[in-house]
From Swiss-Prot:
Gene label: cry1Da
Name this polypeptide is given: Pesticidal crystal protein Cry1Da
Signal peptide: none
UniProt family annotation: Belongs to the delta endotoxin family.
Any one GO MF annotation of this record: toxin activity
Role, per record: Promotes colloidosmotic lysis by binding to the midgut epithelial cells of many lepidopteran larvae.
Additional comment: Toxic segment of the protein is located in the N-terminus.
Lineage, top ranks: Bacteria, Bacillati, Bacillota, Bacilli, Bacillales
Coiled coil regions in record: none
Length: 1165
């Protein structure tokens, strides 16, 4: 048979002899040797992946001592046939010769290893082993590049992966046995570095080349898809499945036997034989076949049953459609029912084929319709399904054997024991018109993907998270990158991933380290949960940039800080992650004393080295926080003195160096909280209720506790200014730290504007489980080496309505950009922490303010624009302040008789003082709106005038002989008869209320006989009758002021009486007045209702000045003055006592009498 078009598919079952493959003019007898060898190798890697003689000899017997030139030629021919590209004779012969040479060299290597293993202290054998390793390593370094010759990378891929696998295995050998062979530590470490680097190099080449070949086979027609799918299946087995084991060669990450699972699916050929009965364009297209046959990424499932429907055409009956029932890993009760594939034909009764976790279907024998090439249907007439104990037949058995493509992995035992794949699903491609297609395509999973996630007590167990039984809302399964052995999971927003059920097979309780293989586009955090509380926080450091493709180097490992002890045979796990994190698998590492010590040391070495930007430890990585350094210090301190004392000392010195570098780059003064308010102009300033506490199970160093407050006008606060001299021009800075727990904690960074976040971080109590003993050390210190829980690093949003919901991580950070610096202006950056609610609280420490990066591009332009806007507003403010200050000073000066401000003018009254004070408070930017204890640009002139206002009030109070005449102290100093009340009105004013005519309030006052006094009363009368304030002596000499609710002017013949409309006297007092310092809003028209939730520095609105007016900013001396409503009047009379005592009496005839103040003032001489 000739092939006229090399791009045309020639399926093996189109031929008169389906067991032959035609390649050009050659015939290759196939027992699918490549698949046999590859699956045998996979089985070996799965079950015997332990360094030593057994592995070395096994690799020789399976591959390098078994395969000869003819078998290597079959490896090359398989791909040549698929991609219709023949390797040039020279390149082909060179590749086979190189492979043969490597085989011969490896036989010598194995023989030398066997001799050394019998006498490991023999110097000659040790030297021989070094010679053989060096020769083997050099040969592989030379040979492997020849297996990726340009233009033949795809054709050579299956032999490339075998050579790469061999190279990684001998590099692991020297990493394990090198010291006993006589290599020094530096050489061993260098070869281990080669190993870890080449794992990525070889993996990426295999995956990239596989994808290149696959893309090359994409086409338009169904025949193109058949070749495409065959390439995908065959190279998944011969290349990608082997690559999935490459990370296990990292002996320091996987020091013991490791159980790996392959969760990918492979699809057998479409039963399609009559392609010549109709033009190719009339068949389903390439894309239609791919969409119909290949399932989208999904959680791993296992077959429970098929329900098969039979259809017919002419005299032929065939598989016309089916339903699939399946179950997820670890659960057999919740069946998943597929949609109907094909049609629900009724030519014959439906047939049900069953399977189970313990009895899987491992083989099919299909009878393809029209083997005589006359059947008008391309499909299946019958299938025999073989499981591990019996067989089931749909209509009839046939010669098309699934073992031809998916042979057993172990031919030395019966197929029911040595099978490699289990049937998991079947899809369908249908065409009804013309020559009919009823193409059932079986999909298979590797047997390593077990129906239950069993965790071994003696192996490292890798469980892909795609084996979860439930996928959380918002989580998704995405196509794997090719080297993970299956698909992976991710989320597009913060939330749960999906529930994974595992079974512990060993004696319980058993302890394991929990590790995750992941990729992340940024530094992320997550939470690991299982059915026994509590949850465990875990970090996912950045491994790649957003938008980059997933490569081998994109994936890393992250481990829970301490092992977890499990006491139940079955547990369910879930992982709470942020967006941009990709999860491959969870790994369970059994804990033993020696292994734990070695594992702890290796982990400590990795995390210590990861602190620095380079191996010479000259600088810290920017994303290494001060809190993280403290935790690394704890990790090093907990290393075993018995196993690794010298290494512990070395690591401890490195961590101390890292801590010193962290202190040097931190621009905050006293970051360790040695004291608050210790120095007036340096360090931390704060409210008196803040406490400093020593290290505990969360913090290694001091931390601060901020309690709540009962009055939001008096918040709990902590602040510090970063001096201008420490800042660089056009640079971004970052404030960051660690919060143990908080509620309503407000964080501010202020320069040109305020960056603001409200952070709520629920704590989890003690970090130690209740079952842990010795939580406290012998001297009362926290035992940081005791097994402890991890903090929950990211939590659901818990902000109340109307508040900005910032991040809720224990780790917080806030950026601010600095433009031009000016030492004379000394603008600096204010760092503020504030709580203004009763339920608020916070515990925080490890605070840092450090340089992040210079500003470039758009960020630079934005900060320049913000700086210009700020300076324009500052200039406007200065002009305004000049005018306002002049008016305010004139009002204040008018209250006094001289510039010494020690005497008031005779006619100065309370309304004049309040009016002057209001003018003073028109001076804006006296204090920061965010925290009114921090002085602003106009603080000096404001406090100058405010001090004189205080003096005026003091002098005025001294002139009033009546004690508690404003009733601010209730009824203190007053004699009371009957029922009266003192009520607070209009926020801050206390007034005397006399509601009954029989009630009376009086006070005895000492005076100077013969001197003149002014009695001044401000009051309001409700209802009928009169309110009276009387002044008298023991005998006669009585005067009174009367108040009523009528409009007639009252005449007092014996005295000079003035009736004043009090509200008019207060001049500009319109509505409620709050004595506070305004921000920019009033002058520039900004909306004061906009909350102070400033956006990211990357958004333009971040630089818009939107500071709110703070109603709690006081005049720093007395309570807010609120003018009285209309209706209150002030009346005066002159009184000349004849004795040294007078009585002031207040009463009424009916209705209600409300008195604001009573004053008795000595006249000037």
């Amino acid at each position: 048979m000739e092939i006229n078009n090399q791009n045309q598919c020639v399926p093996y079952n189109c031929l008169s002899n389906p067991k032959e493959i035609i390649l050009g003019e050659e015939r290759l007898e196939t027992g699918n040797t490549v698949a046999d060898i590859s699956l045998g190798l996979i089985n070996f890697l799965y079950s015997n992946f332990v360094p030593g003689g057994g592995f070395i000899v096994g690799l020789l017997e399976l591959i390098w001592g078994f395969i000869g030139p003819s078998q290597w030629d079959i490896f090359l021919a398989q791909i040549e046939q698929l991609i219709s590209q023949r390797i040039e004779e020279f390149a082909r012969n060179q590749a086979i010769s190189r492979l043969e040479g490597l085989s011969n060299l490896y036989k010598v290597y194995v023989r030398a290893f066997s001799d050394w293993e019998k006498d490991p202290t023999n110097p000659a054998l040790r030297e021989e082993m070094r010679i053989q390793f060096n020769d083997m390593n050099s040969a592989l370094i030379t040979a492997i590049p020849l297996f990726r010759v340009q233009n033949y990378e795809v054709a050579l891929l299956s032999v490339y992966v075998q050579a790469a696998n061999l190279h990684l295995s001998i590099l692991r050998d020297v990493s394990v046995f090198g010291e006993r062979w006589g290599y020094d530590t530096a050489t061993i470490n260098n070869r281990y570095s080669d190993l870890t680097s080449l794992i990525h190099v070889y993996t990426n080449h295999c995956v990239d080349t596989y994808n290149q070949g696959l893309r090359r086979l994409e086409g338009r027609f169904l025949s193109d898809w058949i070749v495409y799918n065959r390439f995908r299946r065959q190279l998944t087995i011969s290349v990608l499945d082997i690559v999935a084991f490459f990370p296990n060669y990292d002996i320091r990450t996987y020091p013991i036997q490791t159980a790996t699972q392959l969760t990918r699916e492979v699809y057998l050929d479409l039963p399609f034989i009559n392609e010549n009965l109709s033009p190719a364009a009339s068949y389903p297209t390439f894309s239609a076949a791919e969409s119909a046959i290949i399932r989208s990424p999904h959680l791993v499932d296992f077959l429970n049953s098929f329900t098969i429907y039979t259809d017919s055409l002419a005299r032929y009956a065939y598989w016309g459609g089916h339903l699939v029932n399946s179950f997820r890993t670890g659960t057999t009760t919740n069946l998943i029912r597929s949609p109907l594939y094909g049609r629900e034909g009724n030519t014959e009764r439906p047939v049900t084929i069953t399977a189970s976790p313990s009895v899987p279907i491992f083989r099919t024998l299909s009878y393809i319709t029209g083997l005589d090439n006359s059947n008008p249907v391309a499909g299946i007439e019958g299938v025999e399904f073989q499981n591990t104990i019996s067989r089931s037949i749909y209509r009839k058995s046939g010669p098309i054997d699934s073992f031809s493509e998916l042979p057993p992995q172990d031919a030395s035992v019966s197929p029911a024991i040595g099978y490699s794949h289990r049937l998991c699903h079947a899809t369908f491609l249908e065409r009804i018109s013309g020559p009919r297609i009823a193409g059932t395509v079986f999909s298979w999973t590797h047997r390593s993907a077990s129906p239950t996630n069993e965790v071994s007590p003696s192996r490292i167990t890798q469980i892909p998270w795609v084996k979860a039984h439930t996928l959380a809302s918002g989580a998704s399964v995405i196509k794997g990158p090719g080297f993970t052995g299956g698909d992976i999971l991710t989320r597009n927003s913060m939330g749960e991933l999906g529930t994974l059920r595992v079974t512990f097979t060993g004696r319980l309780p058993q302890s394991y380290y929990i590790r995750f293989r992941y990729a992340s586009v940024a530094n992320r955090s997550g939470t690991f949960r299982y059915s026994q509380p509590p949850s465990y926080g875990i970090s996912f450091p950045k491994t790649m940039d957003a938008g980059e493709p997933l490569t081998s180097r994109s994936f890393a490992h992250t481990t829970l800080f301490t092992p977890i002890t499990f006491s139940r045979a079955q547990e369910e796990f879930d992982l709470y992650i942020q967006s941009g994190v990709y999860i491959d698998r969870i790994e369970f590492i059994p804990v033993t004393a020696t292994f734990e010590a070695e594992y702890d040391l290796e982990r400590a070495q990795k995390v210590v080295n990861a602190l620095f930007t380079s191996t010479n430890q000259l600088g810290l990585k920017t994303d290494v926080t001060d809190y993280h350094i403290d935790q690394v210090s704890n990790l090093v301190a907990c290393l075993s003195d018995e196993f690794c004392l010298d290494e512990k000392r070395e690591l401890s010195e490195k961590v101390k160096h890292a801590k010193r570098l962290s202190d040097e780059r931190n621009l905050l003064q006293d970051p360790n909280f040695r004291g608050i308010n210790r120095q007036p102009d340096r360090g931390w300033r704060g409210s008196t209720d803040i406490t400093i506490q020593g290290g505990d199970d969360v913090f290694k160093e001091n931390y601060v506790t901020l309690p709540g407050t009962f009055d939001e006008c008096y918040p709990t606060y902590l602040y510090q200014k970063i001096d201008e001299s420490k800042l660089k021009a056009y640079t971004r800075y970052q404030l960051r730290g660690y919060i143990e727990d908080s509620q309503d904690l407000e964080i501010y960074l202020i320069r040109y504007n305020a960056k603001h976040e409200i952070v709520n971080v629920p704590g989890t109590g003690s970090l130690w489980p209740l079952s842990v003993e010795n939580q406290i050390g012998p001297c009362g210190e926290p035992n940081r080496c005791a097994p402890h829980l991890e903090w929950n690093p990211d939590l659901h949003c818990s902000c109340r309505d109307g508040e900005k919901c910032a991040h809720h991580s224990h780790h917080f950070s806030l950026d601010i950009d600095v433009g031009c610096t000016d030492l004379n202006e000394d603008l600096g950056v204010w760092v503020i922490f504030k709580i203004k609610t009763q339920d608020g609280h916070a515990r925080l420490g490890n605070l840092e303010f450090l340089e992040e990066k210079p500003l470039l591009g758009e960020a630079l332009a934005r900060v320049k624009r913000a700086e210009k806007k700020w300076r324009d507003k500052r200039e406007t403010l200065q002009l305004e302040t000049t005018i306002v200050y002049k008016e305010a000073k004139e009002s204040v000066d008018a209250l006094f008789v001289n510039s010494q401000y020690d005497r008031l003018q005779a006619d100065t009254n309370i309304a004049m003082i309040h009016a002057a004070d209001k003018r003073v408070h028109r001076i804006r930017e006296a204090y920061l709106p965010e925290l009114s204890v921090i002085p602003g640009v106009n603080a000096a002139i404001f406090e100058e005038l405010e001090e004189r206002i205080f003096t005026a009030f003091s002098l005025y109070d001294a002139r009033n002989i009546i004690k508690n005449g404003d009733f601010n102290n209730g009824l203190l100093c007053w004699n009371v008869k009957g029922h009266v009340e003192v009520e607070e009105q209009n926020n801050h004013r206390s007034v005397l209320v006399i509601p009954e005519w029989e009630a009376e309030v009086s006070q005895e006052v000492r005076v100077c006989p013969g001197r003149g006094y002014i009695l001044r009363v401000t009051a309001y009368k409700e209802g009928y009758g009169e309110g009276c304030v009387t002044i008298h002596e023991i005998e006669n000499n009585t005067d009174e002021l009367k108040f009523n609710n009528c409009v007639e002017e009252e005449v007092y013949p014996n005295n000079t009486v003035t009736c004043i409309n009090y509200t008019a006297t207060q001049e500009e007092y319109e509505g409620t007045y709050t004595s506070r310092n305004r921000g920019y809003d009033e002058a520039y028209g900004n909306n004061p209702s906009v909350p102070a939730d400033y956006a990211s520095v990357y958004e333009e609105k971040s630089y818009t000045d939107r500071r709110r007016e703070n109603p709690c900013e006081s005049n720093r001396g007395y309570g807010d003055y609120t003018p009285l409503p209309a209706g209150y009047v002030t009346k005066e009379l002159e009184y000349f006592p004849e004795t040294d005592k007078v009585w002031i009496e207040i009463g009424e005839t009916e209705g209600t009498f409300i008195v604001d103040s009573v004053e008795l003032l000595l006249m000037e001489e």
